[in-house]
Regions:
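N-terminal auxiliary segments of SAM/dcSAM-dependent transferases
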Residues: 1-26
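Conserved alpha-helix/loop element of class I SAM-dependent methyltransferases that forms part
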Residues: 29, 46-64
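Class I SAM-dependent methyltransferase SAM/SAH-binding core
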Residues: 67-125
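A short acidic, Gly/Pro-enriched loop at the edge of an enzyme's catalytic core
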Residues: 124-135
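A short glycine-rich, Lys/Arg-flanked "PGG" loop and its adjoining helix->strand segment in the class I
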Residues: 149-164
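Short, glycine-/aromatic-enriched active-site segment of Class I SAM-dependent methyltransferases
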Residues: 170-191
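Short alpha-helix
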Residues: 192-208
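Conserved Class I S-adenosyl-L-methionine
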Residues: 213-268
């Protein structure tokens, strides 16, 4: 991403004092501490919430104790979930400093600091060694990245041979036209880089990855029931205009300008 785009994306998600606000609410809700599972959907800010995390894990089938990179990790909910349920060693990468600060605090609070690390950085230029990860994971993160070819080349670079890339992402739907803004990942069109699923797949395969699973998750998404945010925690603590963004997301899905897709790929 260009420096301008990086700054704009970080600004989209970041808010001054975000970590302090989140942790104040968390400590009030759970004065005696909590496991990551007790947060419900609170730290899974993506379509389908924690149910989507569980569904992606079922498809990816990570080995216990595997080494995971979560790209666009946000507050780190999926990373902590993988650490809790699969004993994975997870690095949560996010472009937004405020999200990284909050993610670290939540990881400490839930007692998972030995398994989950947080790294601030750009998914197109990660600081990791070649072939460092067994699994690269992403949920609703790629929509803010314009250079999909560069993204998938970087994901392949950091994957071990036979490692997997698993993601659930929003793509451009069959209906021509723009979705309605603001959306959960973009307040304005300049921050949203959606592509048709066929183009996605071509770029993935062009980067040297083999597609194992390629699935439209629209029918599944329409059946999902949210897992209540526990202890009174609400996602609007850290997301402005949440109801408006969710409304535009639902409307855009209904009109067919956006779709949700799940994929599992491997590095041969």
């Amino acid at each position: 991403m260009s420096e301008k785009t990086v700054g704009s994306v970080a600004e989209q998600y970041g808010q001054r004092g975000l970590a302090e606000r989140i942790m104040s609410a968390v400590r009030q809700a759970f004065p005696e501490g909590a496991s990551s599972d007790e947060f419900g959907d609170f730290d899974h800010y993506h379509a389908g919430g924690r149910a989507a995390t569980e569904a992606l894990a079922a498809a990816a089938d990570p080995a216990r104790g595997c080494i995971v990179l979560d790209v666009g990790a946000g507050l780190g909910g999926p990373g902590r979930w993988l650490a809790t349920h699969y004993d994975c060693q997870v690095t949560c990468l996010d472009i937004t400093p405020e999200y990284c600060e909050a993610s670290e605090a939540l990881t400490q609070f839930t007692g998972l600091a030995s398994l989950v690390k947080v790294q601030q950085g750009d998914a197109l230029h990660t600081p990791f060694d070649d072939q460092a990860f067994d699994l690269v994971w992403a949920q609703n993160a790629f929509m803010n990245i314009e250079d999909k070819k560069g993204l998938f080349k970087e994901m392949r670079r950091v994957l071990k041979p036979e490692g997997k890339l698993a993601f659930m992402e929003v793509m451009a739907g069959p209906t021509q036209g723009s979705p309605h803004f603001p959306l959960p990942w973009a307040d304005r069109p300049e921050l949203s880089f959606l592509e048709q699923s066929e183009n996605y797949r071509k770029k993935i395969e062009g980067a040297g990855l083999e597609v194992l699973l390629w699935e439209d998750m629209g029918p599944w998404l329409s059946t999902v029931t949210a897992k209540p945010d526990s202890g009174g925690l609400e996602t609007d603590i850290y997301v402005d205009n949440l109801s408006g963004k969710r409304g535009n997301w639902a409307r855009s899905r209904t009109e067919g300008t956006v779709v949700q897709w799940r994929a599992v790929c491997t590095r041969p």
